[in-house]
């Protein structure tokens, strides 16, 4: 909904203060990784991943990370990746997920409640003449992460 009825309200703030666009090869309802652009004054970002996967899929993603930790670390700890995406996920478990050891050295990668990444950008990023090229560069850095997650989802289905 673009507008809300503010005729009789003291609070005249708009219903929605941002514009977002999401692209996913498997469709917007898919659990596969997609690419998201969020435009909002003072809160712009480029993001992607598998947001709020259902519990069985989340278990499969955690198992894939556990079983392929060297490959996963080579993706998410790559300096070129980390310069844009310093953190994996937004919400985390406080302890080890069920079925995984509490003393696992890379537990932080298993504690994710979703496998997403986000790159916050200043508003000026989207006003620059080369913002499409720079956006493309950022999403190219995210591709290996997306591929890892998508391969796991493909195997799960």
Where do the language-model regions lie?
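Active-site acidic/histidine clusters and adjacent loop/turn architecture
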Residues: 1-2
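Short secondary-structure junctions and interdomain/linker hinges
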Residues: 9, 68, 72, 79-83, ...
